[in-house]
Amino acid sequence: MLSRTFTLSILPLTISALLLTACQKTEQKTEVAPAASATTNASAVTASAPAAVDMSKETAEYKAWVQTQIDSLLADTQKFVALLEAGKLEEAKALYPKARMYFERSEPIAESFGDLDPRIDNREADLEPNEVWTGFHAIEKILWTQNTTKGTEKLGKQLIADVKELHAKIPTAEVTGDLMVQGSVDLLNEVSTSKITGEEEIFSHTDLYDFKANIEGAEKIFAILKPKIQAKNPALVTELEQKFGAVNQLLAKHQVGQQDYKSYKELTPADTKALAEAVNKLGEPLAQMGIVLQ
């Protein structure tokens, strides 16, 4: 974990408290305090909503978008592994964070398939005793700590097999409005718990790519839900556009060229503090997107 001289104040987010309060106040605008837990599941949200809302158009659009992301994930993973097999170390390192962005944008659906998520994306720090480590981060460690592609052969083949399995399962995913709203919140929690701290890409320090991808994933959900949010709370749309804009402007300061980002080690404590504060300010209005479920 990278050393930081400030304490993050980002709290994990949830949408249940916001929806419960809204249901209790049918004709009164209610100011809701920031949430403090991300443990809410879809059933809790559904139980708090007063009536079912037709989200079929939105869920179909989101599922189709995630499919395009996983299509690209598979294509880039195959290119990445081909580079590993060819011993092209620097080219593999360059493609590694870009390939991962497709997965990071899609996590609300990608992580719903049992142990596929950890097989593809597990960090060394999250391994259980005697658990076999596979996936992107196992390869990352070899590339950046040993500075070689040797030893990645078996891991590369397994990674392609796992990504192919994920690709095949996306059409079977059950996508609901609950999953979309909570998924956007969970993506922000991902940023606040591992990307901001530099723990996600601890060997390559390519955390800003993951950070950007998580924000893009949450912003895509917002874009799809925007017409429904606009109909119920136009001010919330304006606030979310401003808050997403603020985060993206800060990330743009650390962009290199059209597609790359600085090493996370190059960021100062002031840089990471500014990013943390911008993410924190986005958190509560993002959770309020749950109004579309009412």
Where do the language-model regions lie?
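Mature extracytoplasmic or organellar-lumen-exposed domains after removal of signal/transit peptides
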Residues: T40-Q294
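Bacterial signal peptide processing site
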Residues: C23-T26
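Bacterial N-terminal signal peptides that target proteins for export
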Residues: M1-L11
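Long, low-complexity, intrinsically disordered regions
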Residues: E31-A42
